[in-house]
Amino acid sequence: MAIILGVDPGSRITGYGVIKCVGRQQVYVGSGCIRTSSDELPLRLKQIFDGLSEIIRQYQPDEFAIERVFMAKNADSALKLGQARGAAIVAATAANLPVAEYSATQIKSAVVGTGRAQKTQVQHMIQQLLKLPSAPQADAADALGVAVCHYHTSQSLVALAGRANVRTYGRYK
């Protein structure tokens, strides 16, 4: 049984989602958003770090996954988003958690089946996959999507590793 913390970083709103993996089943544990104040960026980064550190203490995850960001609306936004990701990653590494990163396309593909899915489609599929009574808030749904993507990716790697040394007809497969 593994507990995965997924994070959708943002300098104003950082979503988080926690799932527990029992066998091949993913079970919802918790989710929400860290909403930073309108203070200067260094204080917002500290709020992200402190908020995720508390979530890590509360849920005791085994693994940490975060969305990798490739582009933003402008250079300033991209820099702030990168710094928010850094604050989140430092919170994870301070707790000795392994960190995995996934692109938005990978996450959407794992959750919806297409890398071009809309936010509402991700919310709907997260609700269905985790058997939630209602669709989670967009940032929390994205974070849960990161956790689900990490689960599926790690399961695929485990399956591949298990077959890596299987000999079939005199060749490795």
Swiss-Prot record:
CDD domains: RuvC. Its cofactor is Mg(2+). It holds the Pfam family RuvC. InterPro entries: RNaseH-like_sf, RNaseH_sf, X-over_junc_endoDNase_Mg_BS, X-over_junc_endoDNase_RuvC. One of its GO terms (molecular function) is DNA binding. The active site is at residues 8, 67, 139. Keywords: Cytoplasm, DNA damage, DNA recombination, DNA repair, DNA-binding, Endonuclease, Hydrolase, Magnesium, Metal-binding, Nuclease. Mg(2+) 1 binds at residues 8, 139. GO terms for biological process: DNA recombination; DNA repair. Binds 2 Mg(2+) ion per subunit. Its EC number is 3.1.21.10. It catalyses: Endonucleolytic cleavage at a junction such as a reciprocal single-stranded crossover between two homologous DNA duplexes (Holliday junction). Mg(2+) 2 binds at residue 67. It is an enzyme of class 3 (hydrolase). It is found in: Cytoplasm. Belongs to the RuvC family. Homodimer which binds Holliday junction (HJ) DNA. The HJ becomes 2-fold symmetrical on binding to RuvC with unstacked arms; it has a different conformation from HJ DNA in complex with RuvA. In the full resolvosome a probable DNA-RuvA(4)-RuvB(12)-RuvC(2) complex forms which resolves the HJ. The RuvA-RuvB-RuvC complex processes Holliday junction (HJ) DNA during genetic recombination and DNA repair. Endonuclease that resolves HJ intermediates. Cleaves cruciform DNA by making single-stranded nicks across the HJ at symmetrical positions within the homologous arms, yielding a 5'-phosphate and a 3'-hydroxyl group; requires a central core of homology in the junction. The consensus cleavage sequence is 5'-(A/T)TT(C/G)-3'. Cleavage occurs on the 3'-side of the TT dinucleotide at the point of strand exchange. HAMAP family: RuvC. This is Crossover junction endodeoxyribonuclease RuvC. It comes from Shewanella pealeana (strain ATCC 700345 / ANG-SQ1). The lineage of its organism: Bacteria, Pseudomonadati, Pseudomonadota, Gammaproteobacteria, Alteromonadales.
